[in-house]
Swiss-Prot record:
Coiled coil: none
Residue numbers binding N-acetyl-D-glucosamine: 36, 107, 129-130, 145-147, 152
Enzyme Commission identifier(s): 2.7.1.59, 2.7.1.-, 2.7.1.60
Protein name: N-acetyl-D-glucosamine kinase
Organism listed in the record: Homo sapiens
Keyword field contains Kinase: yes
GO CC entries: cytosol; extracellular exosome
Length: 344
């Protein structure tokens, strides 16, 4: 039977599996819930991966008892070697027919491998946030990715938290809100289905669910699109924080990445980028200021890109490469540019 390669995109909110033939054709897809082992634990993580892969195998007409040739896992929280090793051991021990070979990479590495063979910057803003630079020689550098207790700036969680905190601080008279809190306060009570601030505490502590809390970001986006000044302010600040992540990795970027016809390629991953127009002003401000402070004359332009396919495709490619097989990839079909900018 012809070899089949698998890839997993594992996010903090949802996950996806792709099965790919040895000539690069996508055979089947399956999706599921979060596979971030830091959030849900190793046991639940491997069970969800196994269930999704087997569902994809059945869709592709493949016997679930026939192992994949390789499975490349592009996981949120996939950059800790010891945790990755434990995850692979669990997959091998509990599900021996899942795959012959495994490779665990970060969600950023899977994303960039989907979009380009040459490297670039991946800027993730979904439930959480992260920025990873992959240079042409494969070396990596990064900023962020430390989770909601230490960062996640510019993410859906961060936007939701900023909104809630501004309301709390304003009512407490601790800090004046930059704009009227009326819309955000009512949206907060409605989203969490509570009558007052005390009701919010249950969602912050006893019943805290990062994905659920981050979902409040959608209400802030709706407010911003309707013209609410505070919602627009929060998104502008989120754009600024995301831009500062790019500024942080500028000194580590191989100059070759600045020299292509599209400038520095920045791959934007995560649902917050759907609100690019709300992020744009703060993002450009942070990049312009950071470029000037660092005197980064090489950095003259950039292009923002988004994936047309799941980063599971890049995961499959990296997993295949790990065992010596190069999957054919049509990079022009895998990613599309949505914004370009040249500094004056």
């Amino acid at each position: 039977m012809a070899a089949i390669y698998g890839g997993v995109e594992g996010g903090g909110t949802r996950s996806e599996v792709l099965l790919v033939s040895e000539d690069g054709k996508i055979l089947a897809e399956a999706d599921g819930l979060s596979t971030n082992h830091w959030l849900i634990g190793t046991d639940k993580c491997v069970e969800r991966i196994n269930e999704m892969v087997n569902r994809a195998k059945r869709k592709a007409g493949v016997d679930p008892l026939v192992p994949l040739r390789s499975l490349g896992l592009s996981l949120s929280g996939g950059d800790q070697e010891d945790a990755g090793r434990i995850l692979i051991e669990e997959l091998r021990d509990r599900f021996p027919y899942l795959s012959e070979s495994y490779l665990i990479t970060t969600d950023a590495a899977g994303s960039i491998a989907t979009a380009t063979p040459d490297g670039g910057v991946v800027l993730i803003s979904g439930t959480g946030s992260n920025c990873r630079l992959i240079n042409p020689d494969g070396s990596e550098s990064g900023c962020g990715g430390w989770g909601h207790m230490m960062g996640d700036e510019g993410s859906a969680y961060w936007i939701a938290h900023q909104a809630v905190k501004i309301v709390f601080d304003s009512i407490d008279n601790l800090e004046a809100a930059p704009h009227d809190i009326g819309y955000v306060k009512q949206a907060m009570f409605h989203y969490f289905q509570v009558p007052d601030r005390l009701g919010i505490l249950t969602h912050l502590y006893r019943d805290f669910d990062k994905c659920r809390f981050a979902g409040f970001c959608r209400k802030i986006a709706e407010g911003a699109q309707q013209g609410d000044p505070l919602s627009r302010y929060i998104f502008r600040k989120a754009g600024e924080m995301l831009g500062r992540h790019i500024v942080a990795v500028l000194p580590e970027i191989d100059p070759v990445l600045f020299q292509g016809k599209i400038g520095l390629p920045i791959l934007c991953v995560g649902s917050v980028w759907k609100s690019w127009e709300l992020l744009k002003e703060g993002f450009l401000l942070a990049l312009t200021q950071g470029r000037e402070i660092q005197a980064q004359n090489f950095f003259s332009s950039f292009t923002l890109m988004k994936l047309r396919h799941s980063s599971a495709l890049g995961g499959a490619s990296l997993g295949a490469r790990h065992i010596g097989h190069l999957l054919p990839m049509d990079y022009s079909a895998n990613a599309i540019a949505f914004y370009s900018y040249t500094f004056s």
